[in-house]
Amino acid sequence: MAQQSLIYSFVARGTVILVEFTDFKGNFTSIAAQCLQKLPSSNNKFTYNCDGHTFNYLVEDGFTYCVVAVDSAGRQIPMSFLERVKEDFNKRYGGGKAATAQANSLNKEFGSKLKEHMQYCMDHPDEISKLAKVKAQVSEVKGVMMENIEKVLDRGEKIELLVDKTENLRSQAQDFRTTGTQMRRKMWLQNMKIKLIVLAIIIALILIIVLSVCHGFKC
C-alpha cells in the first residue's frame, strides 16, 4: 500500500466538523463536507467514489467519522481506520465535550490523534486487514443471533415451541443414554459368549491332539 493512501479525515457532530486533519491541499475537503450534508442520519457506513479517491463515512449516534483515501487503498483499511478513530474519540469525549463543542474546536486536542491513526493504518496494512476480517466475522455472528432472537420474540408460540423442543431433546438424550447402556451390556455378554466358545474349542482341540498322540490315555 502507498505510504500516503489516507489523505484527509474529520469527525463531525451532525454537519458540524469538530476536528479535521490533512497534510495535503485540494478540493477534497469541500467535497467531503458536501457529502456530509447529504448523508442519511441513520447509523451506517457509506463510501463514495470520485476521481480515483474514496470518501468513506461511518455514522453512529449522531457523529460522523470520515476519511478520504486513494482508490487503491480499498475499503477495508479506510473503514478500519474509522473504527479506530470512533473508539478513541468516544473514549475521550463520549457523552461530554463533543456534545457541545464548536466547529474545529477539537483540532488541537484530537487532530494529532487522527494523524497517528492514519499513520498506523498505513504502516500496518496486514495487521489491520486481519483484525477487520475477525471483526467482520464477529459482527456477522452477532447479526445472525440478534435476527434469530427477534424472530423468536415476535411470536410467543415460537418460544414455547423452543422450550418444548428442548424438553423433547432432553428426554431423547435420556432415552439414548439408557439404550446405549443396554446395548453395551448386550454386546459385552455376546463377546463373553464368543470368548467362552472359542476357549471351549481350543480345549477340545488340545484334548483331541493329546488323545491322538497318547493313543487314548496311555501316555
From Swiss-Prot:
Organism, as annotated: Arabidopsis thaliana (Mouse-ear cress)
Domain v-SNARE coiled-coil homology: 130-190
Topology of the protein relative to the lipid bilayer: Single-pass type IV membrane protein
CDD domains, A to Z: Longin, R-SNARE
Localization (cell): Cell membrane; Early endosome membrane
Record's protein name: Vesicle-associated membrane protein 721
GO annotation terms (biological process): cell plate formation involved in plant-type cell wall biogenesis; protein localization to plasma membrane; protein transport; response to endoplasmic reticulum stress; vesicle-mediated transport
Residue spans, topological domain Vesicular: 218-219
Record family assignment: Belongs to the synaptobrevin family.
